[in-house]
Amino acid sequence: MKTFALILADGQASRMGGEDKGLALLGGKALIDHVIDRVRPQVSHIAISTNRNLEEYARRSPHIFPDARQWQHFGPLSALCTAANDLQLATADWLLVVPCDMPYLPGDLVARFETVSKRTPLCNAYYVETPITMHYNIMYIRPQILQSAIPYLFSGMKTLRSWLQQQRARPVRFEFDGHFADLNTQIDLQEG
């Protein structure tokens, strides 16, 4: 099975004072580098969605793209709508979507999603559930469903949760919430 990753690094990072969150340092290393190190062994290709510092991100993956102009500033759905027209991503069997600010992702993330997807072959979308919360921004989806994000966004809807519900996505349970800690502020980075 061919699984690609899409790392979302296109947020406005308002809680970081506008600093590019993916390039913020944790232990002397950019957050996105931590994420890449966690997902690279699990996937065959990595794409990055970003709206700034494109050259810097291109050093990490040659497959980068900004949000299409008509979808900018709509959060993660902007990246999904833009990715819907990416021919290279369309060749994957599955797409792992993760944010750039979760440096502790588990090493068995794709394997766990794969196991559940084999038991429920008619389901096209999954997301992470922990004892504390649902992580809708960590998805394992069939690239073909990305097209449905476009009319969803044009209809005025903007949440990943509702879009995933529309796709009849299923949660995949992970017991350790610490793997999914998102570092949103400078204080988070200092404590990280």
Curated annotation (Swiss-Prot):
GTP binds at K21, D67, D101. One of its GO terms (biological process) is bis(molybdopterin guanine dinucleotide)molybdenum biosynthetic process. GO terms for cellular component: cytoplasm. Its EC number is 2.7.7.77. Transfers a GMP moiety from GTP to Mo-molybdopterin (Mo-MPT) cofactor (Moco or molybdenum cofactor) to form Mo-molybdopterin guanine dinucleotide (Mo-MGD) cofactor. The N-terminal domain determines nucleotide recognition and specific binding, while the C-terminal domain determines the specific binding to the target protein. Monomer. Belongs to the MobA family. This is Molybdenum cofactor guanylyltransferase. It comes from Neisseria meningitidis serogroup C / serotype 2a (strain ATCC 700532 / DSM 15464 / FAM18). The gene is mobA.
